[in-house]
Amino acid sequence: MKKLFSIFLLALLMSVSLGLPAAAQDRLTITDLGTLGGTRSYAYGINNLGQVVGYSDTSTGQVHAFLWEAGVMRDLGTLGGDVSVAEDINKRGQVVGYSKIATGEVHAFLWQDGAMTDLGTLGGSDSAAYGINDKGQVAGYSQTASGMYHAFLWQDGVMTDLGMLGGTASYGYDVNEKGQVAGYSYIDSREYHAFLWENGVMRDLGTLDGVLSVALDINERGQVAGYGPPYPTSGDMHAFLWEEDDITDLGTLGGDGSVAFGINKHGQVTGYSQTALGEVHAFLWEEDAMTDLGTLGGRYSLAFGINDLGQVVGYIQTGSNEEHASLWTVSLPPASPEEQIGAIIEHVARLVDSGVLNAGQGNALQSKLENTLRQLDKVNLQAACNLLQAFTNQIQSLIDGGILSSDEGQSLIDEANAVESQICP
């Protein structure tokens, strides 16, 4: 399962909270999301609208998936049983997870517009969904008719078996907008490796010099977050970031182990780690630095999801020793105009790589942005503003011509307008 609570961490929960350095505390807000009436809740996914999903105890003692938005936690119900868990949510508000059905089996579900739909299985009795992209493609795993578990990609009512790396089982945990799926698969009867599946091919991502690895999340750049032992004889796990055949050990918060669960489009990674004092704390990793996200009166915290705004979700132990879903919001210094333009250039490049734009269209857009950077370097703000306006005009033409979707095109226009608001008179 995606929310794998590593034994090495849970066994090491100890006394008081280490807390955050004063400078980081000034920029961090931790919000207790409450419960559905019970004493426990856990948050696993968040979209860029700040909608959060997870599960909570109800007042009657059942476990139900929830959707939290603007201070209100909504019970999503079940597929007929007494348990449901929500794992991920996309920008359309579609939620995926798993639930017991009336006969007791566990099935993957898709919730939207107030209705929970059973996604079925690959022929076996159980299935679970863990990731959904904005196209509505769903990643997870299911029992097959032979009784083994295989990763799947579900779309428009069809559940596709993604196969394995040669072993007996595979598990899918996330899918990005390109339809790339991240997860892990057994390569023989004992060892398992992280994989990246794309267009029918399952690729072994290797390990951190150990014998095992697990991939749990993937962003639009194809960067993968997960964990594995840092060397063959290690009994601990370390969070890792995989990118273009390179797998990087993200280290720890001073303790022995760490696990990475989420990654956003900026390459920010979240998860949890043992600290130097032997406690377990949520972390945010970026630019080769792992930051302790602290706790909220209790002894420990764990993080599982992050959106493109840098908001992190997970759970905390409260001062009253309950476990509650939590939302971390870090107020980061605003990006410079140059940094924002660089991000737009990367956005355009991804559209070319995915085939949405052809090379000529991409080059024309990137040329305008690169020339904007040159004008900014010369402090020629009017020329820079003119180039940004030409960029947005070209994007609008691509929308009008049906080449870019309105959502994708408007996203680029909004990014360019954000720069204009800072530099244009």
Where are the regions a protein language model picked out?
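Bacterial N-terminal signal peptides
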Residues: 8-17
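Residue-level hotspots at or immediately adjacent to binding/recognition sites across diverse folds
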Residues: 4-5, 20-333
